[in-house]
Amino acid sequence: CRHFDFMSSMAVDGIVNYGIGDWCAPFDGPAISVNMSTFKAPVALTDTACYYRSARMLSKMSRVLGLDDPYLARSEEIRAALLRNFVDADTGEVAGACQTSDGCVAFHHLLKPQEEARLMERLAERIAQNGWHIDYGILGSKYVLNMLGEYGRTDVIYKMLTREDYPG
């Protein structure tokens, strides 16, 4: 609860823009510690998604323990803020237009099932257009690989992970 309270204290209108972002993605330029502003996936997107996940987990724990559950309503407020700020309502495009951004929104199941399925199609297309190259860091590795697996796209995972050129 303390970490959630801390994230809540850092949130502005439901958005948390405090954290490390998608570290270690392949990039050109200076060292990662001075290159965070060039991350493709907005730090506020990945941070807010983690904030949302924390609210969902606390909600589940509260219900299991038979306690009052203020977290479910809070999670829906966070979800609404995240979608409003990072997902185009008309096109479904996620801010950052990258593997991590798409994977993040899908991993946290922020969209309706049919919208999530379209997002996963777009993610597979994005990866193919990038020559099957990995284009994510530490957070994206969890999001992208898990969601491709969940959607049965092991063919995409295989092509990504067997690249012999960088980054592969």
Which residues does each PLM region occupy?
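Active-site core of glycosidic bond-cleaving carbohydrate-active enzymes
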Residues: 1-168
